């Protein structure tokens, strides 16, 4: 089914060519060198027949527009073969038309390109007037896209400002049940609102300019911290030395008192029981001697 229209058109073109040749040979002498029909004419007619056959397979809206663009392409091909600049510009316009195929309402898509091509052939200096318009549209799209990105980045800083305005509005409007408020309480409320506004400003500054400490600043902070630690140690050092000295003196006194008590107790105990002490000492010595003798190894008989 798909090849029937093209084959019929091709056969009709061949019949028409054959009839023209027969008429020329009958009326005037036919010479091969004077043949007006060339191979290029056959190719161009075959291409037009193929274009007409494509119309049956396209929707009604796209068929007319696509056939015009294809015919225009085939017409321009022979003219553009010897001019590379014109070929590049034609390819740009055709690529743009294919991109704009979905938007038929666009003014650029609905231009009369056949008439415009004739105008371009007459005035070759104005051939490049279409491209700046199209590039301008692309630049506008890029600018809108970048503007949206910038707006998304600034949303973080806009939120604290809105909260600040809400706080000011709440502080300015006093409800009826708090109409009878003392001036001290009002001052406290104002101070709180100021603190909140300062916090919001700090948040905005942090979001806009993140903290970036340089090496010199870091070194200065480390030096300040070390100096402060040395000062605190020098201030707190006299107290432990005094405490350690007092502790040592107390321990020495306690030892001296303990030794004195020990000597006193033993001396009194010896005075009260001198005989018992001597007897117990002798008895222990004798017992030790007997135990040593009994533990000696005796020779076997």
Swiss-Prot record:
Cystine connections: none
Ranges of Polar residues composition bias in the record: 170-181
This protein's name: Uncharacterized protein C12orf71 homolog
Superkingdom classification of source: Eukaryota
Organism name: Mus musculus
Low complexity bias spans: 226-237
One Pfam family of this chain: DUF4640
InterPro entries in alphabetical order: DUF4640
Annotated transmembrane regions: none
Region described as Disordered: 167-186, 225-244
């Amino acid at each position: 089914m798909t090849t029937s229209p093209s084959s019929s058109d091709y056969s009709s073109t061949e019949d028409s060519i054959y009839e023209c040749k027969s008429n020329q040979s009958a009326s005037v002498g036919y010479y091969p060198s004077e043949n007006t029909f060339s191979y290029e004419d056959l190719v161009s007619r075959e291409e037009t027949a193929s274009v007409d056959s494509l119309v049956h397979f396209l929707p009604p809206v796209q068929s007319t527009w696509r056939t015009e663009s294809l015919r225009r392409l085939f017409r321009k091909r022979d003219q553009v073969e010897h001019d590379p600049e014109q070929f590049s510009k034609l390819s740009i316009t055709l690529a743009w038309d294919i991109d704009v195929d979905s938007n038929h309402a666009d003014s650029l898509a609905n231009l009369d390109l056949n008439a415009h091509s004739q105008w371009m052939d007459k005035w070759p200096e104005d051939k490049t007037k279409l491209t700046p318009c199209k590039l301008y549209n692309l630049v506008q799209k890029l600018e809108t896209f970048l503007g949206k990105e910038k707006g998304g980045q600034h949303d973080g800083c806009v939120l604290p400002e809105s909260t600040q305005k809400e706080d000011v509005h709440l502080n300015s409007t006093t409800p009826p049940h708090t109409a009878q408020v003392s001036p001290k309480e009002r001052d406290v409320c104002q101070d709180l609102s100021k603190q909140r506004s300062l916090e919001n400003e700090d948040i905005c500054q942090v979001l806009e300019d993140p903290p970036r400490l340089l090496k010199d600043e870091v070194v200065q902070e480390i030096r300040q911290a070390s100096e402060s630690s040395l000062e605190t140690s020098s201030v707190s050092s006299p107290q432990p030395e005094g405490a350690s000295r007092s502790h040592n003196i107390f321990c020495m006194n306690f030892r001296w008192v303990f030794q004195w008590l020990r000597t006193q107790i033993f001396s009194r105990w010896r005075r009260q029981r001198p005989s018992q002490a001597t007897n117990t000492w002798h008895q222990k010595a004798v017992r030790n001697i007997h135990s040593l003798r009994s533990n000696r190894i005796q020779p076997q008989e």
